[in-house]
Amino acid sequence: MRNVAIFIFDDVEVLDFTGPFEIFSVCGLRSGGEKPFNVYTVAEKQNIRARNNLLITANYLLGTCPQPDIVLIP
């Protein structure tokens, strides 16, 4: 399984990280196979305020996340 880290930050546009999060999360489910990706969010602080004032809690802080194979920066 590959680790996919999505870096989030204050004023991030919600669709810019939730779209890729969803795609990597459901990849492989239709075929009934094992999930090929472990997807998680990473930030400099635990709580992030998105552009529309939505409060998001990051899965990991920088330096504490599993070693990523893929890093996405919206």
Question: What are the roles of these predicted feature ranges?
Answer:
Residues M1-P74:
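Extended, subdomain-level signal for the structured scaffold at the beginning of enzyme domains
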